[in-house]
Every structure is written in structure tokens, then in C-alpha cells.
Amino acid sequence: MAPRRERVSTLPRLQLLVLLLLPLMLVPQPIAGHGGKYSREKNEPEMAAKRESGEEFRMEKLNQLWEKAKRLHLSPVRLAELHSDLKIQERDELNWKKLKVEGLDKDGEKEAKLIHNLNVILARYGLDGRKDAQMVHSNALNEDTQDELGDPRLEKLWHKAKTSGKFSSEELDKLWREFLHYKEKIQEYNVLLDTLSRAEEGYENLLSPSDMAHIKSDTLISKHSELKDRLRSINQGLDRLRKVSHQGYGSTTEFEEPRVIDLWDLAQSANFTEKELESFREELKHFEAKIEKHNHYQKQLEISHQKLKHVESIGDPEHISRNKEKYVLLEEKTKELGYKVKKHLQDLSSRVSRARHNEL
């Protein structure tokens, strides 16, 4: 990868972004195999498209992903998380369609970002057809969670922490969420790496060797920079997991939730004034409280699901009806809170990103 960073380009920006878009669209290969269901016409409904009766989403491709996820037998908590991610994706895609009509994404940069985000969702929930991503994944702890990490280093750290006696059950829950957050960062990094590799292959195939000395692509350099930032974040995350797994949680931690910790670390190195940084800190506290509320509902949903399965095995219609009603209410509340958390995270991440770019 390193030698490619020195490449230069005189190609028009639009042509380069087309190169980036094409490999992005090729990533979810199992979906493409379904024929016309994921064609451009199907993926770009009319601006005023309304949700069909009984469908979760207004966009057909998202309904198809949702149905596929349900066939994978993901846990209720995991399905609720996916639902929130798809709702965010739907909102962003519909907003992008309005921008496109107004001619505000002529270079295709926002479209490329949307495709990247969808590919991250496919990888995160095992919808990309890769066997190693088909594992059951849960935010809740159980006896078999070690197998979900998929990395011997993480499994060793987790086993050491779990058997050290340094953590209460609540702290183990918190540490487990940190491990899952770290795993998701690796997945996002791999999606970006795959995207960049495909873009560069297309880039080299398009150009003759004589052109290479005169080419500089701001787009590819930007992607390499993002890749380096993500790798730095992954390395810092692993260092933190090692430290916490060996030493336990200290009493001086500013924040506890891994996503909030990441945002705070980024904010401190961004171009914020002292007043802006303090304001951001306060907002992060509110965000963390929102995450904790969401975590609480996730746990209640898991408990309700187990109870419903037990009642169904007994076969008492009255108890089944009552427990099912409670389960459905918890499921909807968990989805709603999940959407709010992800939207808030997106907004906070954008603010930090803008501040960091202003500094550059």
C-alpha cells in the first residue's frame, strides 16, 4: 500500500470518483446475485415513495436486507440494532436523492459515502455472504460470547479479564461492549481497505505507465489518510483493551461507553476552542446517558424474549398473549432508542470531523 500513496493525478475529479464508486458497488456480491432486485431502478424509488403495508422500510433493497437478516436468526437485540442502522441508512439515502435532484452531489462523493456505509452494515451483521461474519452477535453476555470475537488476541484478553476477579458483573458487561466496539472498528477498516484496493486496481488498469508519473489523486490520498486514521484508532483501542483487561477500570475515567471515549479522544485533538470543547464534553455526557438507557432496554428485550420462549413452550394462551404484547412494546422502544443513539452519534462524529478538517 505504501508506494501507492505517492501517486499523482491530473484526471478530473469526477472520473476518479467514478472509479471509487464502481468497486464500492461490487462489494456486496451475494446481493448482486439476486438479479434485478438490487438494480438502480429498484434502489432509487420516487422521492414521494411511501412504505407498503406490512413493510418496515420505504426502500425495497432495505426491506430485502431486513427479511434476509430475519432468516439468519439474529438475536432480538441484534435485529433491533440492524433496524436502527437501516433506518439511518434510509434517511441518509432519501436525503441524498433530494440533493441529487438539486444537483448538489455532482462529483458523487456523497453517493460513495452512502454505498460505503451500506457495505459496513452488510459486514457488521453477516449480510455480505462471508461465513466468518455469520456468527450470532449480541451486546449481552452469555457463556459462548468468547467465540464471537474472531481474533485470538481478543479472545485471550477477554478470557484473562473474565477470570481475573478484577471486574464486577456490571464492569464485565461494559468491557464486553468495548470488545464488540473494537471488533466493529476492524470490520469498518476492512471494508474501507477493500474499497480502496479495488479503486486503485481500476485506477491502474485505466492509466498507461507513462501517465503514472504525472498523476496525483486527491481522492485516493484522502482515502489513504482516512485509512491511516482508522488504523491509528484500532491500535489505540487495542492498547486500551490490554490495559483495562490487565488492570481493571480505574476511578478516574472521564467516560465509560467506548463510542463516547472515542469521540472524546478525537475532540481533544480537534480544532475546538476551550469553550467549544467544554460544551462538547457536556453533550457527550448527555449522549452517554442516552446510550445507557438504550443498553437497559436491550437487556430488558433479551429477558422478555427468553421469558416469551419459556411461556410458549408451556402453551398457556393467556400468558403467551400478555408476554408477546410486552415483548413487542419493548422491541419497538429498543428500535426507537437505537435510532436516536445512532443519529446522535452521527451528528457528534460529523462535528468532530469538521473540526479536525478545519485544523488541517
Swiss-Prot record:
Q: Name one GO cellular component term.
A: cell surface
Q: In chain numbering, where does the motif Prevents secretion from ER fall?
A: 357-360
> Pfam families under this entry?
Alpha-2-MRAP_C, Alpha-2-MRAP_N
As recorded in UniProt, coiled-coil segments are 184-302
Subcellular localization(s) per the UniProt record: Rough endoplasmic reticulum lumen; Endoplasmic reticulum-Golgi intermediate compartment lumen; Golgi apparatus, cis-Golgi network; Golgi apparatus lumen
Give expression by tissue. Highly expressed in PYS-2 parietal endoderm cells and in the kidney. The RNA level increased about 10-fold during differentiation of F9 embryonal carcinoma cells to parietal endoderm cells.
Entry-linked SUPFAM superfamilies: RAP domain-like
Q: How is it modified after translation?
A: N-glycosylated.
Tell me which residues bear Phosphoserine. S53, S138
Q: What does this protein do?
A: Molecular chaperone for LDL receptor-related proteins that may regulate their ligand binding activity along the secretory pathway.
Protein name (database record): Alpha-2-macroglobulin receptor-associated protein
Per the UniProt record, the source organism is Mus musculus (Mouse)
Give the taxonomic lineage as stored in the record: Eukaryota, Metazoa, Chordata, Craniata, Vertebrata
The gene behind this protein is Lrpap1
